[in-house]
């Protein structure tokens, strides 16, 4: 297969040429080009006057030798207007029912049918066969048709009970278009005087018939790796579990896979990647509500599973659990402990400081920071005599928060393990320890786990970088993946830097 960087660069330049003079239609042009290069159909949904027909006309110039046919359907349209008139000569002389197809759909490579759902059953049934089999029955013969791209357009969706489901299912790519939104683009649109009949494509970029035929064979050899299949299957399972999800036929999944193969091929790759799978957002929806649903499910898929983001976070959680267990064990050893001295009249134990405490002023570190008096507190400064008096007699005790300012009232307690602790206003407690006892490096077993996570994350980022660029996927979707990987990196870093 000739999957090279040169091919990817050529297709990118071809797309940019086709996009010239069309504003806020970059994604639409690129997907229509992908459909044309892989022999698929596109449905454009949107109000009148938003360049739907111009997009279809522009795609003709992607090929060196391509005929185009376009037609605006009405409820009065006849098959003769789409597939060609009957040959009176053949009917009169030979009694044959034959159409004159020159200049009509059966001899066109690029086809644009506007207001598609207004066509009658005779047109739609013939069109269905043409899309399915790329064949057209003309009298007693059945001819192969050269159609590479069918662009169907409408300002409405097909009626649910109108018998149009089979044809709608053949429209693999579905795009929802709107008017130009950005001020600068709207200005450029108004002052642009170029004709939609002008060819913006340099001859060297246009596709020959031989190249097109060869590429159809090459696309079939693009691999679906196990990770790609698992992602697609996971998406299918997610959608099957949702009541509001659209029905997606096996045929549509199969055709969508070939589109992903084509995306990989024309981006210079020999296998489908998670980035290509983003294209399913334009293949699986049925109406506005399911468009939103599909996009949401795909976003979850690519930001949680495409590059092992959720798996990495789960393993990080496991490492953090090990770390917390280790720190709890260390807390038992490091905590500032007091000694039982006995009880007063059998009612209550009293405590005293260990004899090893010699300093007159104690700096005690909170093993977990708390908010005290509207300040995040990491350590306390308490006078030894004040603490000893509190242990003996109870009452009020005061200390400096983080060792600065005036002394503040403290809510100290001795827990059931004889550890000195402090509580905040919500009664959340944190055990206190002496600074010199608290500095304790993590064991190699845990630090190695963090390093392993960092290595796995770097590998996933390398793969993500390797899978780019992808001409047919909007940059904002790639940014979602990058943001999710960055979030994983930040969580790992935060865990490593925790005291």
UniProtKB/Swiss-Prot annotation:
Positions annotated to bind ADP: 23, 49-54, 196
This protein's UniProt keywords: ATP-binding, Chaperone, Cytoplasm, Hydrolase, Nucleotide-binding
Pfam families: AAA_lid_8, ATPase_RavA_C, bpMoxR, LARA_dom
Chief localisation class: cytoplasm
Molecular functions (GO terms): ATP binding; ATP hydrolysis activity
SUPFAM superfamilies given in the database record: P-loop containing nucleoside triphosphate hydrolases
E.C. number: 3.6.1.-
Catalytic activity: ATP + H2O = ADP + phosphate + H(+)
Stated regulation of activity: ATPase activity is stimulated by ViaA.
Cellular localization per UniProt: Cytoplasm
Segment forming the signal sequence: none
Taxonomy, superkingdom: Bacteria
A GO CC term attached to the entry: cytoplasm
Purpose of the protein: Component of the RavA-ViaA chaperone complex, which may act on the membrane to optimize the function of some of the respiratory chains. RavA functions as an ATPase.
SUBUNIT field: Homohexamer. Interacts with ViaA.
Family: Belongs to the RavA family.
NCBIfam families, alphabetized: PRK13531.1
Protein name: Regulatory ATPase RavA
């Amino acid at each position: 297969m000739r999957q090279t960087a040169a091919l990817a660069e050529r297709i990118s330049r071809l797309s940019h040429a086709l996009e010239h003079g069309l504003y806020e239609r970059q994604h639409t042009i690129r997907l229509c080009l992908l459909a044309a290069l892989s022999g698929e159909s596109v449905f454009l949904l949107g109000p009148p006057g938003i360049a739907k027909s111009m997009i279809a006309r522009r795609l003709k110039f992607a090929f060196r030798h391509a005929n185009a046919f376009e037609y605006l359907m009405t409820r009065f349209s006849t098959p003769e207007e789409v597939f060609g008139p009957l040959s009176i000569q053949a009917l009169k002389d030979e009694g044959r029912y034959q159409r004159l197809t020159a200049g009509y759909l059966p001899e066109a490579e690029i086809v644009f049918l506007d207001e598609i759902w207004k066509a009658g059953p005779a047109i739609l049934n013939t069109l269905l066969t043409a899309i399915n089999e790329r064949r057209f029955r003309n009298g007693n013969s059945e001819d192969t048709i050269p159609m590479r791209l069918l662009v169907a357009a409408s300002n409405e969706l097909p009626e649910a009970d109108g018998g149009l489901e089979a044809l709608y299912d053949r429209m693999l790519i579905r795009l929802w278009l709107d008017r130009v939104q950005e001020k600068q683009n709207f200005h450029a649109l108004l002052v642009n005087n170029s004709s939609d009949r002008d060819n913006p494509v340099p001859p060297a970029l246009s596709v020959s018939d031989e190249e097109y035929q060869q590429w159809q064979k090459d696309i079939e050899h693009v691999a679906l790796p196990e990770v790609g299949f698992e992602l697609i299957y996971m998406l299918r399972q997610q959608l099957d579990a949702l009541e509001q999800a659209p029905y997606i036929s096996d045929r549509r999944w199969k055709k969508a896979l070939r589109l992903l193969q084509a995306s990989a091929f024309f981006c210079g790759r020999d296998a489908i990647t998670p980035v290509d799978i983003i294209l399913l957002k334009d293949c699986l929806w049925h109406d506005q509500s399911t468009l939103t649903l599909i996009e949401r499910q795909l976003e979850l898929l690519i930001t949680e599973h495409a590059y092992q983001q959720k798996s990495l976070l789960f393993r990080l959680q496991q490492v953090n659990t090990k770390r917390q267990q280790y720190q709890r064990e260390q807390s038992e050893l490091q905590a500032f402990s007091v000694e039982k001295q006995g009880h007063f009249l059998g009612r209550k134990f009293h405590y005293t400081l260990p004899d090893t405490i010699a300093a007159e002023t104690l700096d005690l570190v909170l093993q977990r920071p708390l908010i005290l008096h509207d300040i995040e507190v990491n350590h306390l400064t308490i006078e030894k005599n004040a603490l000893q008096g509190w242990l003996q007699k109870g009452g009020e005790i005061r200390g400096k928060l983080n060792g600065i300012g005036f002394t503040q009232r403290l809510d100290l307690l001795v827990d059931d393990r004889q550890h000195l602790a402090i509580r905040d206003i919500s009664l959340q407690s944190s055990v206190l320890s002496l600074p010199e006892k608290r500095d304790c490096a993590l064991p190699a077993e845990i630090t190695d786990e963090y390093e392993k996570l960092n290595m796995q994350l770097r590998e996933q980022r390398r793969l993500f970088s390797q899978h780019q660029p992808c001409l047919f996927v909007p940059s904002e979707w790639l940014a979602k993946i990058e943001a999710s990987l960055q979030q994983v990196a930040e969580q790992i870093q935060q865990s490593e830097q925790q005291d």
